[in-house]
């Protein structure tokens, strides 16, 4: 059975809409190039902003942009009183140092929760802004009354935006967590041990039916596109049909992630 994120999105949207009436909220998005998955994400952000009355400024830069120009753009947004949250859209061209650029964002405007300061708060279990997609995964599981505590959770993917912070957040929920990746030996066997499997590898239909079992909950974080522009997740359709519950793509984690981005903006704006 497929599970969706629309109801969770609507709950967060109402919270954000109310805050937008009370405090100044301004989101800046810096985009480099025209990656299809990032364009889809930005479309979702625009729509959410329109529905909640939040100001969004999008800075579009070419693939060939230099790091110095990007740093200047970030600096200007850091100093803007109209902007309370900044997002650097990834992936970035290989010529740019993503970590250096993300950490140039004022941590008080780090709407994605991936600045080293905010990741440090996650590691030390201090209150702070959490990365959006991991927040979305936890929100989806809890909204559908899926037990996390005591469960075996396998995460395929170890990025600093999804896999690694999600492992910490799942551990904080008292799950037993295994982090895998494309070079994990016996990946199929590791996946099959899971009660909850999270696919965050960024490869189209990477998780196949022989990697899941009928009692498993599968959360698909992936946003990929086929040759015809159809959105596909990291989980193959046959795998979704073979497990107990699976998040939909589209309409699953992606729509909650956008909402969680604005929820983070709400938190930062109230502190500004």
From Swiss-Prot:
> Function, please?
Catalyzes the oxidation of 5,10-methylenetetrahydrofolate to 5,10-methenyltetrahydrofolate and then the hydrolysis of 5,10-methenyltetrahydrofolate to 10-formyltetrahydrofolate.
Classification via InterPro entries: Aminoacid_DH-like_N_sf, NAD(P)-bd_dom_sf, THF_DH/CycHdrlase, THF_DH/CycHdrlase_cat_dom, THF_DH/CycHdrlase_NAD-bd_dom
What's this protein's family per the entry? Answer: Belongs to the tetrahydrofolate dehydrogenase/cyclohydrolase family.
Q: How does it assemble?
A: Homodimer.
Q: Where does NADP(+) bind?
A: 157-159, 182, 223
Q: Might you report a single GO cellular component term?
A: cytosol
Tell me which domain of life the UniProt entry assigns to the organism this sequence originates from. Bacteria
Q: What name does UniProt use for this protein?
A: Bifunctional protein FolD 2
Instruction: Kindly state which reaction or reactions the protein catalyses.
Output: (6R)-5,10-methylene-5,6,7,8-tetrahydrofolate + NADP(+) = (6R)-5,10-methenyltetrahydrofolate + NADPH; (6R)-5,10-methenyltetrahydrofolate + H2O = (6R)-10-formyltetrahydrofolate + H(+)
Coiled-coil features, chain-numbered ranges:
none
Specify the pathway: One-carbon metabolism; tetrahydrofolate interconversion
Concerning Pfam families, the annotation shows:
THF_DHG_CYH, THF_DHG_CYH_C
Q: Which residues cross the membrane?
A: none
Give the species this sequence originates from.
Answer: Syntrophomonas wolfei subsp. wolfei (strain DSM 2245B / Goettingen)
UniProt-listed GO biological process terms: L-histidine biosynthetic process; methionine biosynthetic process; purine nucleotide biosynthetic process; tetrahydrofolate interconversion
The encoding gene? folD2
GO molecular function per UniProt: methenyltetrahydrofolate cyclohydrolase activity; methylenetetrahydrofolate dehydrogenase (NADP+) activity
**Which UniProt keywords are present, listed alphabetically?**
Amino-acid biosynthesis, Histidine biosynthesis, Hydrolase, Methionine biosynthesis, Multifunctional enzyme, NADP, One-carbon metabolism, Oxidoreductase, Purine biosynthesis
Q: Give the EC number(s) listed in the UniProt record.
A: 1.5.1.5, 3.5.4.9
């Amino acid at each position: 059975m497929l599970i969706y994120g629309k109801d969770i999105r609507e709950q967060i949207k109402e919270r954000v809409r109310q805050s937008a009436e009370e405090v100044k909220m301004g989101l800046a998005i810096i985009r480099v190039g025209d990656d299809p998955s990032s364009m889809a994400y930005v479309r979702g952000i625009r729509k959410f902003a329109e529905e909640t009355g939040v100001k969004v400024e999008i800075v579009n830069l070419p693939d060939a942009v230099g790091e110095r120009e990007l740093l200047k753009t970030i600096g200007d947004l850091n100093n803007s009183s109209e902007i309370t949250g900044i997002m650097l859209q990834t992936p970035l061209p290989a010529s740019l140092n993503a970590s250096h650029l993300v950490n140039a964002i004022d941590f008080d405007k780090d709407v994605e929760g991936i600045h080293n300061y905010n990741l440090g708060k996650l590691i030390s279990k201090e209150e702070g802004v959490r990365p959006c997609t991991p927040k979305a995964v936890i929100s989806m599981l809890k909204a559908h009354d899926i037990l996390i505590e005591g469960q075996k959770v396998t995460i395929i993917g170890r990025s600093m935006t999804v896999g690694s912070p999600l492992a910490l957040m799942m551990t904080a929920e008292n799950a037993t967590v295994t982090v895998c990746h494309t070079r994990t030996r016996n990946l199929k066997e590791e996946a099959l041990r899971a009660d909850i499997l999270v696919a965050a590898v960024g490869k189209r239909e990477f998780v196949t039916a022989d990697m899941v079992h009928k009692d498993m909950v599968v959360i698909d974080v992936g946003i990929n596109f086929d040759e015809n522009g159809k959105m596909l997740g990291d989980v193959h359709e046959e795998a979704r049909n073979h497990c107990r519950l699976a998040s939909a793509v589209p309409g699953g984690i992606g729509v909650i992630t956008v909402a969680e981005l604005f929820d983070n903006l709400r938190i930062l704006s109230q502190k500004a």
